Amino acid sequence: MAQIFHRSTNTLSRLSIFGALFLVVGLLWLIATINRSSYVTEQNVTRAQPLPFSHDHHVGGLGIDCRYCHTSVEVSPFAGIPATAVCMNCHSQIWSTSEVLKPVRDSLKSDTPIRWTRVHNLADFAYFDHSIHVRKGVGCSTCHGPVDQMPLMWQAASLQMEWCLGCHR
């Protein structure tokens, strides 16, 4: 019987199959890499805020405990963003006329909360209870990183499931 295809066709077919396999594996690797990158997880990305609140100054410099501002962290699933009145506990006496704190004073006067940009944002299907973790002795820096060294807040961990499993295994 006569040969229909040239002998090099077998080589070409093998190269095509291995090339397609290499391309599929490469695309899967690329997708997995992008999914874990700071572009998706927003890890180590500083978020713009309505005013420059420095955890470095308040926690690191002045030694204010996280629970002074985030009062519900031990009893509620959510740590919460402090009310403007908490800021004014100190700033009605200290830096009370500072131009930087004008939005805080205006917020208190108008009884309108400051619209902070959320830094740590879990996926909608994930449930995280701050109070359980705090009562079990998990420190704030375990998840939030070195907050006492952050002039502006950023997300120190990826907060993806594989990161959580690092402790929960």
Predicted regions and their residues:
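Sequence context surrounding c-type heme c attachment/ligation sites in exported
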Residues: 47-102, 129-169
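Primarily the internal scaffold of c-type cytochrome electron-transfer domains
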Residues: 2-6, 31, 94-126
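A generic short-segment signal for beta-strand/edge and adjacent turn/coil regions
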Residues: 18-23, 34-38, 55-57, 93-99, ...
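N-terminal export/targeting leaders of redox proteins
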Residues: 1-52, 56-60, 64, 73-82
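Arginine residue identity/basic-tract feature
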Residues: 7, 14, 36, 47, ...
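A short linear-motif detector with a strong N-terminal bias
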Residues: 29-33, 45-47, 66-68, 104-108, ...
